Regions:
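Conserved catalytic-loop position in the HRD/HxD motif
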Residues: 131, 136, 154
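C-lobe/activation-segment region of protein kinase-like
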Residues: 151-226
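Short alpha-helical scaffold element within the canonical Hanks-type protein kinase domain
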Residues: 113-117
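Juxta-kinase regulatory segment immediately upstream of eukaryotic protein kinase catalytic domains
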Residues: 1-19, 218-223
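A short beta-strand motif that forms the metal-chelation/ATP-contact edge
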Residues: 89-94, 149-155
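AlphaC helix of the protein kinase catalytic domain
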Residues: 100-109
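Hydrophobic residue at the +6 position relative to the catalytic HRD Asp in the kinase catalytic loop
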Residues: 137-144
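Conserved ATP-binding subdomain of kinase catalytic cores across diverse folds
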Residues: 8-99, 119-130
Length: 226
């Protein structure tokens, strides 16, 4: 997909009456436009990162297309932009659904929540077996779609390998998810056996055993520090 230049005037016109979904101290980061599409802004980095060579907007678009190619729903990319101030942006149609975190928060029956966690375990294994290393994987970046399937959002920080992930990369992925208090309780405490059962539907026994040992070790360390 070609990258278009977006002037400040055109940006202001595009975002007129838009709803700010996410912002930081420098301004809006994600905007819900009046036509129900979204615009995600990536500001120029002041230090070296891989995004200095390949803008995060382009990585977002490339990863979205590659994921869709292997059957994982992601936002549909409409346009890519470079802005005169050095920022970049991606214009896309959102996936219809709610984050897995929101859905789990709304479930009151433990058995229903457990079944959903098991399904997520299978989905996570699918990502790992297909070589998807989503560095920012957490329950706020996984959507439960209207048909009940899972999709991914905010996919700029990702690498897709030609073969299944190594055990070390799977461990790093889990460590990232363990940083989120609510996610950790649902996935690795309350419904950990369900998560393992789902993961085992697709992943190898060695991968399942590695996941189990890592979570158990983290639990022991937390209790020791407590």
């Amino acid at each position: 997909m070609s990258v278009k230049t977006l002037t400040q005037t055109a940006l202001q016109k595009l975002t007129t009456n838009a709803q700010v979904i996410e912002e930081d101290g420098l301004g809006p980061k994600v905007l819900h436009l009046v036509d129900d599409s979204f615009l995600k802004l990536f500001r120029q980095r002041r230090w070296y990162t891989s995004g200095s060579f390949t803008p995060y907007s382009e990585r977002f678009a490339v990863n979205s297309e590659r994921l869709r190619h292997i059957g994982i729903p992601t936002p549909q990319i409409l346009d890519l932009y470079r802005i005169k101030d050095g920022s970049s942006a991606v214009h896309y149609l959102p996936l219809p659904g709610n984050t897995l975190r929101q859905v789990l928060q709304g479930i009151t029956a433990p058995d229903v929540r457990e079944a959903l966690v098991q399904r997520f375990g299978k989905f996570m294994a699918q990502l790992h077996e297909q070589g998807v290393y989503f560095r920012s994987l957490h329950l706020g970046n996984v959507l439960v779609l209207e048909d009940g399937e899972f999709g991914l959002i905010d996919v700029a920080d990702m690498r897709i390998y030609p073969s299944s992930l190594s055990l070390s990369l799977r461990q790093r992925n889990l460590r990232h998810m363990q940083r989120y208090t609510v996610d950790r309780r649902w996935l690795f405490e309350d419904h950990f056996q369900a998560l393992l059962q789902g993961y085992a539907m697709t992943a190898s026994k060695s991968a399942v055993d590695t996941l189990h040992k890592q979570v158990m070790a983290a639990g022991l360390a937390a209790r020791a520090n407590g």
